From Swiss-Prot:
Residues 1-54 form a transit peptide. SUPFAM superfamilies: FtsH protease domain-like, P-loop containing nucleoside triphosphate hydrolases. The gene is FTSHI1. Gene3D superfamilies: 1.10.8.60, P-loop containing nucleotide triphosphate hydrolases (3.40.50.300), Peptidase M41 (1.20.58.760). Keywords: ATP-binding, Chloroplast, Hydrolase, Membrane, Nucleotide-binding, Plastid, Plastid inner membrane, Protease, Transit peptide, Transmembrane, Transmembrane helix. It holds the Pfam family AAA. It is a multi-pass membrane protein. InterPro entries: AAA+_ATPase (IPR003593), AAA_lid_3 (IPR041569), ATPase_AAA_core (IPR003959), P-loop_NTPase (IPR027417), Peptidase_M41 (IPR000642), Peptidase_M41-like (IPR037219). In the N-terminal section; belongs to the AAA ATPase family. In the C-terminal section; belongs to the peptidase M41 family. Its main location: plastid. One of its GO terms (cellular component) is chloroplast. This is Probable inactive ATP-dependent zinc metalloprotease FTSHI 1, chloroplastic. Oligomer. The chain crosses the membrane at residues 289-309, 320-340, 369-389.
Length: 946
């Protein structure tokens, strides 16, 4: 490699800038080089600012023509083109190069004597340099100061205080050479920015202003003295904000220190403030003089005008108005004085010689007033005492006591007037979903209420009473309101507990009043909710030891029930009144109330089926803002046994979750979170398993889930598919596996292959532990093993699906309360149903045989499950790692893993991945929610590794 001298032999000169102020990118490069310098020199990259000027040599035209192309540029030229932001601009003035500041100083006219002075200085420096080169002895600063007898000037910075980080930053921003925004972006694109330093922005936001930055560039190999790696940059606030958003490299922000300062105000004013104050005072004096002059002129004019007006008014009043009004004033004053004189004479006559007082005394004495007042004294005393007593009693009443009303006692025995005269209950049959059977049964009542004459002509007796029974929340009250809303008739609604009061006879009175109101406004509907509080079965008073139960409270309740029985089917049945009762405890009702003639129809309102649940969810979803990507049919099919009230609560809970997560509408994830909160419970924040515990739980749950997917994929099994797996602790559980529910027929007619596949799914948790951990299994899968043991025994004994076919009834070995986390693996509770096939252990040999056959069946299915999971060990381990990383995984993701990790995939392919816990997969509902825009992390390419 050529030396530095070879470079200078090319005519290239280097000069180091002293203190540039701006970054103007101008490069002077040679278009051609001399033909005699063909040696290629690999110079180190110069990162600091430098200036390169290549002088043209004569006789090099031929070589210049060949080097015009970019590929023929020398190394230094290419460095200048690639790193324009690091080259400080230089300007040629004569034969000398100057930076921007030096060129500005030259333009001021001071360079006339500078040339001669610089020439003398260079001569002196060269002479001094030759003298110092000759002397090779060491020179110390103390010796120089000791020998020096002149004045010694020390820079004041030596005695100055240490600058803080913030002050040093401001100084560097001011002194360092400036870099433009375009240069910084070029350096950022080439990854040459080492550090970007800025100062913390204060709490007050400014729309205009500037922010300073210090840019540290990366060093490159080469001469360090020729590199400048530190620059300053000053940008507007908007440009600075845009730059900080765009720049993603290392940053350092200097914290702004807020300190209080207490000091003495200077005795003398600031010269600028003094000049401003004096100018303001002069202007104020001029304005005051102008205002005073204007006031004198305007004041004189106003005074003249006021004097003229007042003079005119005085002359008019004295010489015109007063002569005209004088006769009238004399007349009115004379009449007024005459009236006063006559009145005074009359008053004197009345009050003289006793006057009126003597007449009043005679009337009181001889008119009998005194004797009457003596008789009224005791009467007034009694009245005043009663008034004070009542006033004291009313003042002691509680705050929530009603206003004293004489008719309150009468209204106490009446039923509350809850009739809607127009039948405006606000509910129609269109608002009722999921209980189509009950609605069809009640259509006849609506027809009768709309047209009762048609039934009377045909001689048809409509059903007098209808009992609605069923679990809570299934829509019994809603159906009753829909009947009145469809028919448009008055609707009277009361609860069974409202007929019970502290006073005797109030319940019967309210029954009579309620039916009286309904008969007056017939056709009408009477609805009593929770009728079991009113019509409980009566006690048998003729049985032994039953008199103690027949107390006053029981007698009052039975009296109210008797009145209800009479109103329903007595001598006056009251045609045109439909009676509806609702209860969820039919077994408590009195048999006399349930007989035909009183309750002619008893309609069972059951929980809705899958179609009914879907209709209910659609009705409630129409009242909230729900995303179109939410699949309501999956929730309708996977939530068996849920009533309409619970489905309504699900939608409301999902809306609350969406608000809590600041979503614009209800998403699929919000519905899933709401299902988990209502079934399992909320997330337990304080409970978090360690890594080993999470690995065990994840292995067990993934083993159960992936076994079902493998059986569906390779054996076409008719079992549930996994919906999602979670290891987030909720409620009383540490992990959950949610399955998709099959149709109802699959649970009614279970076949042996289907039950054996379910047995393999239950054994999948323990099998997965053995595949991953070997014989070091844990009790994490004990919940699934208990169900598997009883399922195998029940296949042999009660369901008799294995030979020999012998019924051997026995009760379940343990009682379990199923916790719903999706479609249960115990087949809707039928797993622990003994079908009343329970017998005492008579043949103990049969018990031993059943136990032996159950053990063989479990071992056989367990070995098959272990073999199936060993073939897919890579997919199993990949699913476990993804679950540990994401805490929750969907069934679609499990299918994605099984597609990319087929059976017999080498385990090393998974272990060689950079991040085995990542998965480049987005579920379908998330893709729909994001508008078909999916961002997938391609850090791990599964297709390339499998």
């Amino acid at each position: 490699m050529a030396s530095i001298d070879n470079v200078f032999s090319l005519g290239t000169r280097f000069s180091i800038p002293e203190n540039p102020k701006r970054s103007i990118l101008k490069h002077a490069t040679t278009s051609s080089f001399s033909a005699r310098t063909q040696t290629r020199w690999r110079a180190p990259i110069l990162r600091r600012s430098f200036t390169v000027l290549c002088e043209l040599k004569t006789g090099s035209s031929s070589s210049g023509e060949t080097n015009n192309s970019p590929a023929a540029d020398d190394f230094v030229t290419r460095v200048l083109k690639e790193n324009p932001s690091q080259v400080e601009p230089r300007y040629r003035v004569g034969d000398k190069l100057y930076n921007l500041k030096e060129r500005e100083d030259l333009s001021k006219g001071t360079n006339a004597a500078t040339g001669a002075f610089e020439f003398i200085k260079r001569k002196f420096d060269s002479k001094k340099k030759t003298e110092t080169d000759k002397s090779e002895e060491s020179v110390y600063l103390s010796d120089i100061l000791r020998e020096y007898k002149g004045k010694l000037y020390v820079p004041e910075q030596v005695f100055g205080p240490e600058l803080s980080e913030e002050e040093e930053f401001e100084k560097n921003v001011k002194d360092l050479p400036k870099m433009s925004l375009e240069d910084f972006r070029k350096a950022m694109e080439n990854d040459k920015v080492k550090l970007l330093t800025s100062k913390e922005v204060s709490g007050v936001s400014y729309t205009s202003g500037y922010r300073g930055f210090i840019v540290d560039l990366k060093e490159i190999p080469g001469v360090k003295s020729l590199q400048r790696t530190k620059w300053s940059m000053k940008l507007e606030v908007g440009e600075a904000q845009a730059l900080l958003k765009e720049y993603t490299g290392p940053q350092y922000e200097i914290e702004r220190h807020m300190t209080s300062w207490v000091g003495k105000v200077a005795d003398f004013p600031n010269p600028v403030a003094s000049s401003i104050s004096s100018r303001v005072m002069v202007e104020l004096g001029m304005v005051t003089a102008v205002i005073a002059a204007a006031a004198v002129v305007v004041g004189g004019f106003l005074a003249s005008a006021v004097f003229a007006v007042t003079s005119f008014a005085f002359v008019t009043t004295v010489y015109v108005v007063w002569p005209i009004a004088k006769p009238f004033l004399k007349l009115f004053v004379g009449v007024f004085l005459g009236v006063l004189e006559k009145s005074w004479d009359y008053i004197v006559d009345v009050l003289a010689d006793g006057g009126i007082f003597s007449r009043i005394s005679d009337f009181y004495t001889f008119g009998g007033v005194a004797s009457s007042l003596e008789m009224l004294k005791p009467i007034l005393l009694v009245v005043m005492t009663m008034v004070l007593l009542v006033r004291f009693t009313l003042s002691r009443r509680p705050k929530n006591f009603r206003k004293w009303d004489l008719w309150q006692g009468i209204a106490f025995s009446q039923s509350k007037a809850e009739a809607r005269v127009d039948g405006s209950t606000g509910v129609k049959f269109a608002d009722v979903a999921g209980i189509d059977e009950a609605v069809d049964e009640l259509q006849e009542l609506v027809k009768y209420l709309k047209n009762p004459d048609l039934f009377d002509k045909m001689g048809i007796k409509p059903p007098h009473g209808v009992l609605l029974e069923g679990p809570p929340g299934c829509g019994k009250t809603l159906v009753a309101k829909a009947i009145a809303g469809e028919a448009g008739v008055p609707f009277y609604q009361m609860a069974g507990s409202e007929f019970v009061e502290v006073l005797v006879g109030v319940g019967s009175a309210r029954i009579r009043d309620l039916f009286k109101r309904a008969k007056v406004n017939k056709p009408s509907v009477i609805f009593i909710d929770e009728i079991d509080a009113l019509a409980t079965r009566r006690q048998g008073i003729f049985k032994e030891n039953s008199d103690q139960l027949y107390n006053a409270a029981t007698q009052e309740r039975e009296t109210t029930l008797n009145q209800l029985l009479i109103e329903l089917d007595g001598f006056d049945t009251g045609k045109g009144v439909i009676f509806l009762g609702a209860t969820n405890r039919r077994d408590l009702l009195d048999p006399a109330l349930l007989r035909p003639g009183r309750f002619d129809r008893k309609i069972r309102v059951r929980p809705p089926n899958a179609k009914g649940r879907l209709d209910i969810l659609k009705i409630h979803a129409s009242k909230v803002k729900m995303s179109d990507s939410v699949d309501l049919s999956s929730y309708a099919s996977n939530l068996p046994g849920w009533s309409g009230a619970k489905l309504a609560q699900l939608v409301q809970e999902a809306a609350l979750v969406a608000v809590r997560k600041t979503h614009n509408s209800i998403l699929q994830s919000d519905m899933d979170d709401a299902v988990d909160r209502l079934t399992v419970g909320p997330t337990r924040i304080g409970l978090e398993l360690g890594h080993q515990g999470q690995c065990r739980r994840a292995t067990t749950e993934v083993g159960v889930a992936i076994t079902s997917h493998l059986l569906l994929r390779y054996e076409n099994a008719k079992i549930e598919r996994c919906d999602r797996v979670s290891i987030i602790p909720r409620g009383q559980t540490l992990s959950q596996v949610v399955f998709h529910r099959l149709d109802d027929e699959s649970y009614m007619f279970g076949r042996l292959p289907q039950l054996l596949h379910r047995l393999q799914v239950l054994l999948g948790g323990r099998a997965a532990e053995e595949v991953i951990y070997g014989s070091d299994t844990s009790k994490a899968s004990v919940d699934y093993l208990s169900d598997a043991s009883w399922l195998a025994r029940k296949i042999l004994t009660i369901w008799n699906l294995e030979n020999p076919m012998v019924i051997h009834g026995e009760p379940p070995p343990w009682r379990k309360r199923p916790q719903f986390v999706g479609p249960r693996l115990d087949f809707e509770g039928s797993l622990y149903d003994d079908y009343d096939l329970v017998e005492p252990p008579v043949n103990f040999n049969m018990d031993d045989e059943v136990a032996h056959r159950s053990e063989e069946l479990i071992s056989q299915m367990y070995n098959k499950t272990v073999s199936l999971l060993r073939q897919n060990q890579t997919a199993l381990l990949k699913t476990v790692k993804v679950l540990l990383n994401q805490k929750e995984i969907s069934g679609e993701a499990i299918d994605f893993i099984l597609d990319h990790y087929p059976p017999q995939t080498p385990l090393n392919s998974l272990l060689q991945e950079q991040n085995p816990g990542s998965l480049p997969f987005v579920p379908e509902h998330l893709r729909r929610e994001s508008g078909d825009f999916v961002l997938v992390n391609h850090s791990t390419d599964v297709n390339a590794q499998v």
